[in-house]
Amino acid sequence: MKKPFPFSAIVGQEQMKQAMVLTAIDPGIGGVLVFGDRGTGKSTAVRALAALLPLIKAVEGCPVNSARPEDCPEWAHVSSTTMIERPTPVVDLPLGVTEDRVVGALDIERALTRGEKAFEPGLLARANRGYLYIDEVNLLEDHIVDLLLDVAQSGENVVEREGLSIRHPARFVLVGSGNPEEGELRPQLLDRFGLSVEVRSPRDVETRVEVITRRDAYDADHDAFMEKWGAEDMQLRGRILGARAALPQLKTPNTVLHDCAALCIALGSDGLRGELTLLRAARAQAAFEGAEAVGRSHLRSVATMALSHRLRRDPLDEAGSVSRVERCVAEVLP
């Protein structure tokens, strides 16, 4: 079976790749929303990043990929204490999915054949410690998106139905993609995503030719292509793991907190999610760059992806949300 396309070999789309790397460093940033044209590497980037990350150690047979035997939920009835290594999970959420399929439900077959009340885990269980990818998230039913965002934020899935009361860990990075021409997300849901980026098809011939060349090389001689880009992927993996380890020791000056608040006030963003996400993303960026403390340069680097989707629409301002954030950053964080 072919390995996913190397993350380092993806041409362009730097902001999308940056957002995904930051969530790999600190999943607490929240999900990533990627809006833009079809065929711009959105799903490719998710699978490539997950493949780039180290294998996870999990209990054999555990439906929620528990890292320790004692963490396996009771309802799973896992007797094995054998630890195995498996790739970071990437779970696709289909558009017509039901709530039962997402969160889990009563195992009807066991109930009918054995008369036992057992829990059949859903997609959230499989996605634990990995990625949950939703293509065309703007076409998914609002209550499903709301449910996913709730679980992604809490890190726990709670199921109360048909006489069952089940809890299990569900810590994953939610990545949603979509085409804005096919419909938009409600502002309440937009605000729940940590980062948001816009992607566009390349407009210059050289970039498009490079995309075609790399994809053709990947399909023609998969092993040689993977070997060519393997060193860069391993280097990126090392930087991500180093940034994860450095996060707890990273210093955050009070001036940075002041800058976060001042920027969000200037933009008129509602609530405090903007400041919190901006700070988390800036800390991850600083750790990725090997800095000892968060600075204004890190805030400037992540401001558009952390704040552009949280702005109120201004009918008197024809500029897009990204342009408004960039303009405000230039004024508040010179």
Swiss-Prot record:
One biological process term in Gene Ontology: bacteriochlorophyll biosynthetic process
GO molecular function: ATP binding; ATP hydrolysis activity; magnesium chelatase activity
Broadest EC class assigned to this enzyme: ligase
Keywords for this protein: ATP-binding, Bacteriochlorophyll biosynthesis, Chlorophyll biosynthesis, Ligase, Nucleotide-binding, Photosynthesis
Recorded catalytic activity of this chain's protein: protoporphyrin IX + Mg(2+) + ATP + H2O = Mg-protoporphyrin IX + ADP + phosphate + 3 H(+)
Keyword ATP-binding tagged: yes
Domain of life where this protein originates: Bacteria
Name of one Pfam family that matches: AAA_lid_2
Pathway the protein acts in: Porphyrin-containing compound metabolism; bacteriochlorophyll biosynthesis
UniProt xrefs under InterPro entries: AAA+_ATPase, CHLI-like, ChlI/MoxR_AAA_lid, Mg_chelatase_ATPase-isu, Mg_chelatse_chII-like_cat_dom, P-loop_NTPase
EC id: 6.6.1.1
Residues binding ATP: 36-43
Keyword ATP-binding (UniProt): yes
Task of the protein: Involved in bacteriochlorophyll biosynthesis; introduces a magnesium ion into protoporphyrin IX to yield Mg-protoporphyrin IX.
Similarity remark: Belongs to the Mg-chelatase subunits D/I family.
PANTHER family: MAGNESIUM-CHELATASE SUBUNIT CHLI (PTHR32039), MAGNESIUM-CHELATASE SUBUNIT CHLI-2, CHLOROPLASTIC (PTHR32039:SF9)
Protein name per Swiss-Prot or TrEMBL: Magnesium-chelatase 38 kDa subunit
Organism lineage string: Bacteria, Pseudomonadati, Pseudomonadota, Alphaproteobacteria, Rhodobacterales
Gene: bchI
